[in-house]
């Protein structure tokens, strides 16, 4: 697809996408474990395959995960393999769909977008039961919600990109030709249904000629920055520079950084934000250097049921993801996995073999300057330690 420009300027080059439907309506995803060296589309036909793709990080990014789960459920309900159909009893349909969405949600509990999407289906099931709807009507209702989950994401990403770019330019654009910004992880079209969240803001700045350079962290151990964000930014021909995670402090010392822009997997009531590991350290450094720190996430990422970030469940990943690295062998031209630690690290139970590998960290609201959703921008007021994110829901 060609992304619509947020101004009257020339359209961007084609963006990558993480999910597509084939001619029969079957869901396919790019195996992101193989990026950027190999683009392989893999079919996802069943809820079990969707669960596995999410769990093994073949697809990642909270909005993209929600889209995959929803689209796979829709496709499966339309297939001959589905255990329920219009000829089933309404109770059987409600029971099976309910169990399936519980299963899909358990694949990535930190991603609130996935939970929100599944909650929409739960609410529909409850209402359908109260109205004594037929099995066929229930299935059609669920399938429509699944499609909406995917379709709504692109439109709101475009809105967030514009709002975030306008806010940061007003904050830091005075007298400057372009801004220098920094981001963590991957938040572009590969992590969403299109355009992206934090990358959407960077793209909007670029489209308005308000961007100097986008710095992006490698984001180890999974290298979402060096593998995926690098691919997206080079595809879009956006001026960018990769930095190692350990170079953040040096970057702030030696470059006039105008803003840190990140996405989120969950934003709770007081503004505390769970995002990819490494976000918290970027926020600490941003505050030390008086740099605005912006979180960009759709309303579906905001969880008002949790008062603070202390209640957010943090997923810990397998040790092998930190002790091994996948890449292209420049001699053979083939993808390979190599160990980067001594043998035994992360594999045994000795005190010297441990590996600490959380997938996310939580950035306190007091380190965040603003949260952007498709509904608006909520700024943290001077001296306060929380952000009124409910005002932009």
UniProtKB/Swiss-Prot annotation:
Subcellular location: Cytoplasm; Nucleus
Active site: 265
Main location: cytoplasm
Cysteines engaged in disulfide bonds, as pairs: none
Enzyme type, top EC level: isomerase
EC number: 5.3.1.23
A GO cellular component annotation in the UniProt record: cytoplasm
Pathway this chain belongs to: Amino-acid biosynthesis; L-methionine biosynthesis via salvage pathway; L-methionine from S-methyl-5-thio-alpha-D-ribose 1-phosphate: step 1/6
GO BP, one annotated term: L-methionine salvage from methylthioadenosine
Keywords, ordered alphabetically: Amino-acid biosynthesis, Cytoplasm, Isomerase, Methionine biosynthesis, Nucleus
Reactions it catalyzes: 5-(methylsulfanyl)-alpha-D-ribose 1-phosphate = 5-(methylsulfanyl)-D-ribulose 1-phosphate
Site features described as Transition state stabilizer, chain residue numbers: 185
InterPro entries, per database record: IF-2B-related, IF-M1Pi, IF_2B-like_C, Initiation_fac_2B_a/b/d, M1Pi_N, NagB/RpiA_transferase-like
GO molecular function, one term: S-methyl-5-thioribose-1-phosphate isomerase activity
Alphabetical list of SUPFAM superfamilies matching this protein: NagB/RpiA/CoA transferase-like
Superkingdom: Eukaryota
UniProt similarity note: Belongs to the eIF-2B alpha/beta/delta subunits family. MtnA subfamily.
Function: Catalyzes the interconversion of methylthioribose-1-phosphate (MTR-1-P) into methylthioribulose-1-phosphate (MTRu-1-P).
Name this polypeptide is given: Methylthioribose-1-phosphate isomerase
Organism field: Cryptococcus neoformans var. neoformans serotype D (strain B-3501A) (Filobasidiella neoformans)
């Amino acid at each position: 697809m060609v992304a619509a420009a947020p101004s009257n300027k020339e359209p961007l080059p084609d963006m990558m996408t993480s999910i597509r439907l084939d001619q029969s309506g079957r869901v396919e995803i790019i195996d992101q474990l193989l990026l950027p060296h190999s683009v392989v589309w893999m079919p996802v036909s069943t809820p079990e395959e969707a669960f596995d793709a999410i769990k093994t990080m073949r697809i990642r990014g909270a909005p993209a995960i929600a889209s995959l789960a929803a689209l796979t459920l829709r496709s499966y309900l339309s297939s001959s393999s589905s255990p329920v159909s219009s000829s089933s009893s309404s109770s059987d349909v409600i029971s099976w769909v309910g169990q399936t969405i519980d299963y899909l949600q358990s694949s990535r509990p930190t991603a609130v977008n996935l939970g929100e999407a599944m909650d929409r289906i739960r609410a529909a099931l409850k209402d359908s039961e109260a109205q004594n709807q037929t099995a066929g009507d229930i299935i059609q209702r669920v399938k429509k919600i699944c499609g909406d989950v995917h379709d709504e994401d692109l439109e709101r990403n475009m809105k967030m990109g514009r709002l975030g770019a306008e806010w940061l330019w007003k904050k830091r654009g005075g007298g400057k030709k372009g801004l220098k910004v920094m981001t963590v992880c991957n938040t572009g079209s590969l992590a969403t249904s299109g355009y992206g969240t934090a990358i959407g803001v960077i793209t909007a700045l670029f489209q308005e000629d308000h961007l100097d350079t986008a710095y992006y962290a490698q984001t180890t151990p999974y290298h979402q920055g060096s593998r995926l964000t690098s691919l997206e930014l080079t595809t879009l021909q956006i001026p960018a520079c990769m930095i190692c995670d350990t170079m953040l402090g040096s970057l702030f010392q030696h470059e006039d950084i105008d803003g840190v822009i990140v996405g989120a997997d969950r934003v709770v009531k007081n503004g505390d934000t769970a995002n990819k590991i490494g976000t918290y350290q970027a926020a600490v450094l941003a505050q030390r250097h008086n740099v605005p720190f912006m979180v960009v996430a759709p309303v579906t990422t905001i969880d008002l049921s949790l008062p603070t970030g202390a209640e957010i469940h943090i997923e810990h990943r397998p040790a092998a993801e930190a002790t091994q690295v996948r890449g292209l062998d420049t001699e053979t031209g083939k993808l390979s996995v190599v160990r980067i630690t001594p043998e035994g690290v992360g594999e045994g139970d000795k005190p010297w073999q441990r590996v600490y590998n959380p997938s996310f960290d939580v950035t306190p609201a007091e380190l965040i300057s603003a949260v952007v959703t498709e509904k608006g921008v909520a700024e943290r007021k001077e001296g306060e330690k929380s952000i009124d994110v409910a005002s932009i829901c």
